[in-house]
């Protein structure tokens, strides 16, 4: 089943632009060029994986300039029969940051019975064009108690971002223009019933463990790193209790709209 595309990404959900900023030429406003990326897709085949994701796909960057990742929409669909047990945690990562708690931009937990889900993250920070060309963002996926044979794809994810491209540092800051910004740190969103069992294992802890485990194995391709679905490596004790509880989760199926892939 492919994700169903419905409508466009609403820029106003991320940036509160005034009427003058919408009408005036860019030279007269602090906001220069607001763009929506094309869709980037990841097919998840592993129980645990850290994969690169292109959040600026189709975005025209300015040489020697900057790009501000204002917000992104992540849509997912389980490729499973109805009412399957288990679930997933999804975390957006900035791979430049060495401290795991600073590298996590936002995370989301949901059960497999949900079938389709969507969440938004508001990173709201700028990077140089040179850094952006190195594809610095990743997604950490941790699937629990989904019993599927190795070699198949239980979950599909799609990513669309809203960003601002500019040549020089904007004199008037953008933070006051961005809606729903959480200044307390990385956002962790969840379905309530999943959060009951998962909140004691923050995604920053999972990221730190994954990075340590990967470094011991030696350098590998960053795309789809992680343990295979048939791997038998024992879990850390702190995860065992979560696994037992998580196995009994069943949530009502809910529909959600999916971000459009157009860029402009």
UniProtKB/Swiss-Prot annotation:
Composition bias, Basic and acidic residues: 237-247
Compartment list: Host cytoplasm, Host cytoskeleton; Host cell junction, Host plasmodesma
Pfam families: MP (PF01107)
Outcome, altering residue 133 to K: In strain: Ltbl; ability to grow in tomato plants harboring the ToMV resistance protein Tm-2
GO MF term set: RNA binding
GO cellular component term of the entry, any: viral replication complex
InterPro entries documented for this protein: TMV_movement (IPR001022), Viral_movement (IPR028919)
Keywords assigned by UniProt, alphabetized: Host cell junction, Host cytoplasm, Host cytoskeleton, Hypersensitive response elicitation, RNA-binding, Transport, Viral movement protein
Main function: Transports viral genome to neighboring plant cells directly through plasmosdesmata, without any budding. The movement protein allows efficient cell to cell propagation, by bypassing the host cell wall barrier. Forms a ribonucleoprotein complex with viral RNA. Triggers host hypersensitive defense reaction in incompatible tomato plants harboring Tm-2, Tm-2nv or Tm-2(2) ToMV resistance (R) proteins. Transports viral genome to neighboring plant cells directly through plasmosdesmata, without any budding. The movement protein allows efficient cell to cell propagation, by bypassing the host cell wall barrier. Forms a ribonucleoprotein complex with viral RNA. Binds microtubules and modulates microtubule stability. Can bind double-stranded DNA. Triggers host hypersensitive defense reaction in incompatible plants harboring resistance (R) proteins.
Complex formation: May bind to host RBCS at the plasmodesmata (e.g. Nicotiana benthamiana RBCS AC A0A0S4IJL0); this interaction seems required for viral systemic movement. In resistant plants, interacts with host MBP2C at host microtubules; this interaction prevents virus cell to cell movement. In resistant plants, interacts with host resistance (R) protein (e.g. tomato ToMV resistance protein TM-2(2), AC Q71BG9) at the host plasma membrane; this interaction triggers host defense responses leading to programmed cell death.
The protein, known as: Movement protein
